[in-house]
Regions:
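A compositional/biophysical signature of low hydrophobicity enriched in polar/charged and small residues
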Residues: 1-319
Length: 319
């Protein structure tokens, strides 16, 4: 992969900022190849060719539709299950499907150790406690770190029955055209487009890269600043060290805006470990940087059962 491939990946979100809302990378299905081309300096045809290549390589195998748990009156918590033997991770990802309320899991490696991060719903305290106990039983070491709250921007509107129907169609057909969605819910394309845009804009739902996609060769670099350090000055220094820097949005990593003051985070290429190590050392030498931590994504899995059951119940009862 080259810098243009990474730039295209970055601008799958129109603002060029990366978000992970308890899932894989959030993308905007409305972003066109032409809009990406304007950001990365290629022709529209060139962007389309690059997207096809990334898809053929397995990095962009498709999208999934995620529904905001807040529309069901729930929130998300995250816990970490330590992994000592690499062979323990694949069966654990499969077994997590047995735990009601688990929606996503990611196998990660960071400066400290390897773990599977498990994202699950928090609806009532007893339910959260029960799910955490089940995770402990599945954990290869019998240990679970957490859970801790994982903040996602709440949905800003009340959904109508038509909204729920469009959300169902969009979840069933995450890559369908607006005309296809309109046909599925028996409304005009204009109505379907308007409603879908409202659902996306109010964060009732979003698109994410499919969990069948290969992990991009990227590392999450989390940087803690010293007290009094100026973030913009540090960012300018980072740009000279990491030519490819995909900033994580303030609302994109599970912390509410304003709660992570003094922390900068972004994705950087990890194809060359020695180059990444050198970049981290140079990052630590920046005036105002207290620490820097790398996290690598090794794999992930989605678990749709809880969301699908909640959505079916809403469709049965919506007026």
């Amino acid at each position: 992969m080259d810098d243009i491939d990474y730039a295209i990946f970055r601008y799958l979100s129109p603002d060029g900022q990366v978000r992970f809302w308890a899932s894989r990378r959030v993308v905007d299905p409305r972003v066109s190849a032409g809009e990406i081309a304007a950001q990365v300096g290629l022709s529209e045809a060139g962007v389309r060719a690059r997207l096809r290549t990334l898809r053929d390589q397995g990095f962009l195998r498709g999208r999934e539709t995620w529904l905001n748990p807040s529309i069901f009156g729930a929130s998300i918590v995250v816990a970490e299950i330590p992994i000592r033997d690499p062979g323990d991770a694949p069966p654990l990802l499969r077994e997590l499907a047995l735990v009601e309320g688990v929606v996503f899991a990611r196998d990660i490696l960071d400066e400290r150790d390897r773990a599977v991060r498990v994202y699950y719903v928090a609806d009532v305290p007893s339910g959260t406690d029960r799910r955490t106990a089940l995770l402990r039983r599945l954990a290869p070491t019998g240990q679970v770190r957490g859970p801790t709250p994982y903040w996602i921007p709440p949905c800003a509107r009340t959904l109508t029955r038509l909204d729920w129907r469009i959300a169902r169609a969009f979840r069933d057909r995450p890559e369908a055209s607006q005309a296809e969605l309109a046909k599925a819910v028996h409304v005009s394309p204009k109505t379907a487009a308007l409603r879908l845009h409202r659902l996306l804009d109010t964060r009732a739902c979003w698109s994410a890269l499919s969990s069948s996609s290969e992990e991009m060769p990227l590392a999450l670099l989390s940087i803690v600043l010293r007290e009094g350090a100026e973030p913009r000055t540090v960012l300018r220094a980072l740009a000279s060290i990491h030519p490819v820097w995909m900033p994580i949005a303030e609302d994109g990593m599970g912390s509410s805006p304003g709660s992570s003051v003094g922390v900068l985070a972004g994705l950087v290429p990890a194809e060359a470990p020695a180059a990444l190590e050198q970049g981290v050392r140079r990052t630590l030498a920046i005036d105002g940087v207290a620490s820097a931590r790398r996290t690598f994504a090794l794999g992930s899995a989605s678990y749709p059962q809880w969301t699908d059951e909640q959505l079916a119940a809403k469709l049965r009862t919506a007026g």
